[in-house]
A protein has these predicted regions:
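Cytosolic regulatory regions of ion transport systems
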Residues: 1-446
Length: 446
């Protein structure tokens, strides 16, 4: 593909790094250092110039398969989308935005934008489920099914047993899509034994997620629902998380040292949330019992700070603690410290864009476990040529993942179903390194 990326910051750099294999990638930015860094480290073309100036685009290929705008400015991203249409023929455009107003279908249609990403909004959505399933570390929802992918840490005294045996003890439909053990991620088969302290990625319907609690969590964990939450960080993500929690009936407080952020948060939340500036650090607030809360979220843009505050809150006995992860390099560390990790805005922008690029009209997919795992879905629609047939599963594919079929809110192992029926959903769990093989297999008989 011919790919143009407007913006050479952290998000643009990581997208270019991922796409440079088997694609022709050009990155545009007026920051000379950023362009130099990209040219020295990546096999892409860097253009140093003003993204808002049409002359910057002269000389690029007139046929562009994918245009991605990921600067920190909505206005720049939208303007670049207009400019590129006058310079080249563009098949697909993905634009990163901060203000959800610009993500409306009307604006997308007028500017010929294929898809928009609003990272602060998308990054806040897992909290809809983390309140209901407080024993889960993270949760992802999917098209075509009500099943969720939730990560749960097994308790210290968990009795090792095979996955197939364990699933038989759960009330409801559940499958295991991945395991992180001793800092390594892998996709298990049902014959794999699960061990204490494993971080398990369960694919399950809501009733099964509830029943998992008594089996996998510490005995002394309180069963009372989450009623209150403190969010440390009043920028856009903290505000979006607060909106989600308020809709769930949670009493929310937001803290920040920045008085201007507090003022803006208070205006946007319309007094539905207590927002206050504090000159104290979070450790002082926790140690002095300045608040009593069921849930603590460290939502600043500094991962080291978030990690520190999560550890302090954990020592104070707060039952649910979540740290926002802004830098991919800290993702594994946070999970290994048993911090419940939710993607921050920049990481969310990166993964959301990759997920959209690698999805199609046939399959959809999402990354998990810090990008080490991928779950790929294909629905069998009423007019699908797959109805009454079945994709053969060769060993070279089967060895690279775990495959299930969703049918009428039931989960079946792939090999147990003889033929596909209308509305079946084929689900494949795999390592990110094997995604291309699984994707190619699922694209058969479109």
């Amino acid at each position: 593909m011919q790919v143009i990326i407007a913006g050479a910051g952290r998000v643009g750099y990581n997208i270019a790094k991922h796409l440079m294999i088997n694609n022709s990638v050009t990155v545009i930015d007026q920051n000379e250092f950023a362009i130099q860094n990209i040219q020295e480290n990546l096999d892409v073309l860097g253009i140093c110039g003003n993204i808002e100036n049409p002359h910057t685009y002269f000389g690029i290929d007139p046929q562009v398969d994918l245009f991605i705008a990921v600067t920190d400015s909505d206005e720049v991203n939208l303007l670049s989308s207009l400019i590129i249409d006058n310079i080249a023929t563009v098949k697909r455009k993905i634009i990163r935005l901060k203000n959800s107003f610009f993500a409306s279908d009307l604006i997308k249609s007028k500017l010929n934008i294929s898809e928009t990403i609003v990272p602060s909004f998308e990054a806040a959505q897992p909290f809809k489920y983390l309140v209901d399933f407080s024993h889960a570390h993270n949760a992802k929802a999917f098209e075509h099914t009500k099943a969720l992918l939730v990560s749960i840490r097994l308790k210290d005294d968990f009795t090792p047993r095979m996955i197939s045996t364990f699933i038989g003890e759960i009330s409801g439909e559940v499958s295991v899509g991945g395991i992180e053990r001793n800092k390594k991620f892998f996709v298990p088969k049902p014959s794999e034994t699960i061990l204490p302290n494993d971080l398990i990625y369960f694919f399950a319907f809501p009733n099964a997620i509830v029943s998992l609690r008594s089996v996998v969590c510490e005995i002394n964990e309180p069963l009372s629902p989450i009623k209150s939450c403190v969010i440390f960080g009043a920028d856009s993500l903290g505000v979006e998380i607060a909106k989600v929690l308020v809709k769930k009936g949670i009493e929310v407080q937001i803290m920040d040292k920045n008085i201007e952020l507090c003022r803006k948060a208070n205006i946007e939340l319309k007094d539905k949330v207590t927002v206050f500036k504090t000159t104290y650090d979070a450790d002082h607030i926790v140690n002095k019992n300045r608040f009593d809360t069921d849930m603590f979220i460290a939502a600043t843009k500094n991962d080291e700070y978030n990690i520190t505050k999560c550890i302090e809150a954990k020592q104070k006995g707060i039952k649910k603690i979540v740290g926002i992860n802004n830098d991919i390099a800290y993702s594994s560390l946070m999970r290994n410290l048993n911090i419940e990790v939710v993607r921050g805005e920049k990481i969310n922008a990166y993964y959301s864009i990759l997920e959209r690029i690698e999805s199609s009209s046939i399959i959809s997919q999402k990354k998990f476990c810090g990008g080490e795992g991928a779950v790929v879905l294909r629905k069998v629609f009423y007019n699908s040529p797959l109805i009454g047939t079945k994709l053969s599963l060769p060993d070279k594919v089967d060895d690279r993942g775990h495959f299930i079929i969703l049918r009428n809110n039931d989960i079946f192992e792939y090999q147990s179903i003889s033929t596909f029926e209308k509305d079946d959903v084929i689900v494949a769990f795999t390592k990110e390194s094997d995604f291309e093989i699984i994707s190619k297999w699922l694209h058969q008989n479109p």
